[in-house]
Amino acid sequence: LVYIPFWRPDIERPESIVGEGWRFYGFGRLLRHLPERSIKPAPKNERRELKQRIRQRLSRAGANEVLTYSFVHGRVLKNSEQDPGRAYRLSNALSPDLQYYRISILPSLLDKVHANIKSGHDEFMLFEIGKIHDKKLGFNDENLPIEKTFIDGVYANKKPKAGAPFYKVRKIAERLMKDLSVEVDFVKIAESDSDVPAPFDAKRSAWIVAKNGDNLGIVGELVSSARRNFKLPDYTAAFSIDIEKLQENLSKNQGYNYQPLSRFPSTARDISLKMDSNVDYAKVYACAEEVAKKHGELQMSITPIAIYQPKNNDSTKTVTLNVKFTSAERTLEDKDIAPIIEEIAAMAAEEFDAAQV
């Protein structure tokens, strides 16, 4: 124990006692360098890095990020066909326009589309990363409402283009997943599925499903009532992705998908398959992809070209795919490619009675 004499009232803290010890020992005998200490960089925040990567990818695709309030008016919920009863209502709202916690981000984005079109922007895409609160999610261990993080986006074009807007947004979502090295499938929504979030149209939407079966989100067009309520153009589609589930699948796919460019030229072939009109395009693509996996020595990319259906015969359709071949060892010849095209045609004929035309 150390006792402080009564004539030293200046010693009040433990640091003063240490200073006295060094005074007796001699300050001149102190080592002239700083004491060693372990310095570690701050750990990376994986969630923050994922959000930044998403922002960069969507910005490169031409999308614009917006920030909106987490509180919305009840009118916004009703216009998007959402149930206000699922939203938490504030007892001391700052204004009537900020009464409810939003249960999804998409309505906040839809509310901004018409104003941008009136400002002269005919074609654009908006996205936002934010949190949602839904009574269906329940409470956490601290008895607080569970909040989830989503990335929602909407594409709008005042001047309609050929084809459906679904494919435009799906292409953007598909590219985003590919850049993040997350393999997904776009699965058709069953008629009996009642979990389709408003305001998506179940008949014109698809689930975004990871390879392990996790439902990451949804991409598709909106119901006509929501388009009418928000004064949206007909050529409008959107997507909504759960960032927490996306991060879980991202951690399982940490490997890089980089492949060095081949020194040899690529070559491509088209294949047209005539089949029953009830056969889904996804089955045709999966058939070609399965054949491609058997030939791992080649880099093969499959791109849809067209789906043709005669006006006078709606019982059949013709699907055309473009298959691109690349070898890292040599220049490919027709004798290398023709058997693979024939193999795709044979598998399609076996699985859904398709004929090569």
What are these regions (language model features)?
Residues 1-124, 324-326, 331, 336-357:
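Extended, well-folded interaction surfaces typified by the phenylalanyl-tRNA synthetase beta subunit core
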